């Protein structure tokens, strides 16, 4: 951590036991050069300067006004009851420290905008009272007086009994927070806008430098929300007790962080002069400003984040304490206060920034259409080949004539248009399709055309043979019913394959039947090749097979005796005798 960041935490840790102590008039500010050194500043109460302005009341809380000094803004120590007086140097806007009972006004250092710490009883929220002028808070005897030291601006801690009063710059009326005795007078130093943290009891009004808009810290319940009504007074967001008044510097639009209860919006209050609210001990008189009207930035420069209720606004103001004769001029202020003003609230009504947009959604009208086919003959013209080509001049001229004739005849609201103009031989036969709203009949279409045939003379057309009949409305299924060429070829191929398969099956059946027929012929042969087994001898020896009924003897049955010269034969009796 850098010394600039360590200084506020160190001061808070050292002064934590004093948080419960009230009415401590000292305010510790951190030096930009030596951040570890703190200088106590005693509170000074001076008589408030009252101005003869119209008395109006703003129910606001402690305002934190930033000035333009180069030193960073110190944080007021907690547990102090005093107001920190801003010096003449352009100090940045102070950041309110939590748990403090006092208001601190920022000095003239141009440091970046301070952010009030969350969880404090102070917030930069505009209140909803319609009074344009800022009012000192009632019942409090504390004011912030500017000192001449160039120290950085202290940050008012939330829940403090003091107010930081802006002095007379074109910023309209800053309002002191309620419950505080201080006057807030706007001055003309351009300091960057501080970002008030939600839940703080103080308002931080940014000065008129083109510093970026403050953003409310997330997780806090505080924001300054301007009202969209033409009333000058800003409307305080719920749970906040402070206002931040926007002025006419072209600063970028503030954006509230998401998840916060704050919404940034700008309103312009037409009331010129700030006045002290009744029941308060001090009045805030604007000094050294030519205009007291609050200027609003353009609506396009501000962005509203949803779920936020706080406004961040900048004003060209330097804090001036009660009783100071005049505001201290800042070295970085613009030469004229009017140069920072872009739009005065006195001459223009309040501008409310609205984020909700209701774009008109175009409804698609469904119209039921009736189509009619119209045909008629043009007898004074002759058909030729040029009427077959839409690119020829004769075709286009005749087409324009028919269009003009149809538009003159059917001028009613129900007529939607025509299409598909065709010509064919027979003198010239014109065929076209007319579109009408549903409810039109073919008889009415023919009657209208027949009654107004006189219009055809203006186009040098002689019409006869008018016929009208209802045409079917083309559906998407009918439009896409055409079969492509590849589909037809595929279909033919499938048919051929099926035919071949059928032929093959027929041939296969015929072959099977032929085979079965051949087997039957073999079973019943023409030759008698069957012999009963009973006709064969069971066995025989030394002989060969002799078929039954054969008278020829086997040569093996005859046995020669060899040397005896006698024939010896052996006969198998079993084969020759049936008695065996």
UniProtKB/Swiss-Prot annotation:
Region listing for Interaction with P53, in residue ranges: 519-555
- All ranges on the Cytoplasmic side of the membrane: 511-580
Required for interaction with AP1S2, short sequence motif: residues: 570-572
Q: Where is the composition biased (Low complexity)?
A: 38-88, 96-108, 116-128, 136-148, 156-168, 176-188, 196-208, 216-228, 236-248, 256-306, 345-357
**Residue numbers spanned by region 11 X 20 AA approximate tandem repeats of P-A-P-S-P-A-A-S-P-G-H-D-G-A-S-T-P-T-S-S:** 70-289
Residue positions, PTM Phosphothreonine: 551
Question: Where Phosphotyrosine occurs along the chain?
Answer: 530, 539, 545, 556, 570
Q: Please give one Pfam family short name.
A: SEA
Q: Where is this region: Required for interaction with GSK3B?
A: 550-557
Q: Output the SUPFAM superfamilies linked to this UniProt entry.
A: SEA domain
Signal peptide segment? 1-22
Q: Name one GO cellular component term.
A: apical plasma membrane
The UniProt entry, under PROSITE patterns, shows: SEA
- Tell me the tissue specificity: Expressed on the apical surface of epithelia cells, and on the milk fat globule membrane (MGGM).
- Major site of localization recorded for this protein: membrane
Question: Where are its TM segments located?
Answer: 490-510
Lipid-modified residues of type S-palmitoyl cysteine are 511, 513
InterPro entries found in the cross-reference section: SEA_dom (IPR000082), SEA_dom_sf (IPR036364)
Glycan-linked positions: 73, 77, 84-85, 87-89, 161, 201, 241, 384, 460
Please describe the quaternary structure of this protein: The alpha subunit forms a tight, non-covalent heterodimeric complex with the proteolytically-released beta subunit. Binds directly the SH2 domain of GRB2, and forms a MUC1/GRB2/SOS1 complex involved in RAS signaling. The cytoplasmic tail (MUC1CT) interacts with several proteins such as, SRC, CTNNB1 and ERBs. Interaction with the SH2 domain of CSK decreases interaction with GSK3B. Interacts with CTNNB1/beta-catenin and JUP/gamma-catenin and promotes cell adhesion. Interaction with JUP/gamma-catenin is induced by heregulin. Binds PRKCD, ERBB2, ERBB3 and ERBB4.
**Reported function:** The alpha subunit has cell adhesive properties. May provide a protective layer on epithelial cells against bacterial and enzyme attack.
* UniProt-recorded name of the protein: Mucin-1
- Per the UniProt entry, what species is this protein from, by scientific name? Bos taurus (Bovine)
């Amino acid at each position: 951590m850098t010394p600039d960041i360590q200084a506020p935490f160190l001061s808070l840790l050292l002064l934590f036991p004093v948080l419960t102590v009230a009415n401590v008039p000292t305010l510790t500010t951190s030096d930009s050069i030596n951040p570890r050194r703190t200088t106590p500043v005693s509170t000074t109460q001076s008589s408030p300067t009252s101005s003869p302005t119209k008395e109006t009341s703003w129910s606001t809380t402690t305002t934190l006004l930033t000035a333009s000094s180069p030193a960073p803004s110190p944080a007021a120590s907690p547990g102090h009851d005093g107001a920190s007086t801003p010096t003449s140097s352009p100090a940045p806007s102070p950041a309110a420290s939590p748990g403090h009972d006092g208001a601190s006004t920022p000095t003239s250092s141009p440091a970046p905008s301070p952010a009030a710490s969350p969880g404090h009883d102070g917030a930069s929220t505009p209140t909803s009272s319609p009074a344009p002028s800022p009012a000192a808070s009632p019942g409090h005897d504390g004011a912030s007086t500017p000192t001449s030291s160039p120290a950085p601006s202290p940050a008012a801690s939330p829940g403090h009994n003091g107010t930081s009063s802006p002095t007379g710059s074109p910023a309209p009326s800053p309002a002191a927070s309620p419950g505080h005795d201080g006057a807030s007078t706007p001055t003309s130093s351009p300091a960057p806008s501080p970002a008030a943290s939600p839940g703080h009891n103080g308002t931080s009004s940014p000065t008129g430098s083109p510093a970026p808009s403050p953003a409310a810290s997330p997780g806090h319940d505080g924001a300054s929300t301007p009202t969209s009504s033409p009333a000058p007074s800003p409307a305080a967001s719920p749970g906040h007790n402070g206002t931040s008044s926007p002025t006419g510097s072209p600063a970028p639009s503030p954006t509230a962080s998401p998840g916060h209860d704050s919404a940034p919006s700008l309103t312009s209050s037409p009331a010129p002069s700030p006045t002290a609210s009744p029941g308060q001990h001090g009045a805030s008189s604007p000094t050294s400003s030519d205009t007291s009207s609050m200027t609003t930035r353009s609506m396009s420069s501000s962005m509203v984040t949803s779920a936020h209720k706080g406004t961040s606004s900048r004003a060209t103001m330097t804090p001036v304490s009660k009783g100071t004769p005049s505001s201290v001029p800042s070295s970085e202020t613009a030469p004229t206060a009017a140069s920072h003003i872009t739009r005065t609230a006195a001459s223009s009504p309040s501008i409310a920034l609205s984020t909700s947009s209701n774009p008109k959604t175009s409804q698609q009208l469904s119209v039921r259409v009736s189509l009619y086919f119209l045909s008629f003959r043009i007898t004074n013209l002759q058909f030729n080949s040029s009427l077959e080509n839409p690119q020829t001049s004769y075709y286009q001229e005749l087409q324009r004539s028919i269009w003009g004739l149809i538009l003159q005849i059917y001028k009613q609201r129900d007529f939607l248009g025509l299409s598909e103009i065709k010509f064919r031989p027979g003198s010239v036969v014109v065929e076209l399709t007319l579109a009408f709203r549903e409810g039109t009949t073919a008889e009415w279409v023919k009657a209208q055309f027949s009654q107004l045939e006189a219009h055809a003379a203006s186009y040098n057309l002689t019409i006869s043979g008018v016929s009208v009949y209802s045409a079917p409305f083309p559906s998407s299924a009918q439009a896409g019913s055409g079969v492509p060429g590849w589909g037809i070829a595929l279909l033919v191929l499938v048919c051929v394959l099926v035919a071949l398969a059928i032929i093959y099956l027929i041939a296969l059946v015929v072959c099977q039947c032929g085979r079965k027929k051949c087997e039957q012929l073999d079973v019943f042969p023409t030759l008698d090749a069957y012999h009963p087994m009973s006709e064969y001898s069971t066995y025989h020896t030394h002989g060969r097979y002799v078929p039954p009924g054969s008278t020829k003897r086997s040569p093996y049955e005859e046995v020669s005796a060899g040397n005896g010269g006698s024939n010896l034969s052996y006969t198998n009796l079993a084969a020759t005798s049936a008695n065996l």
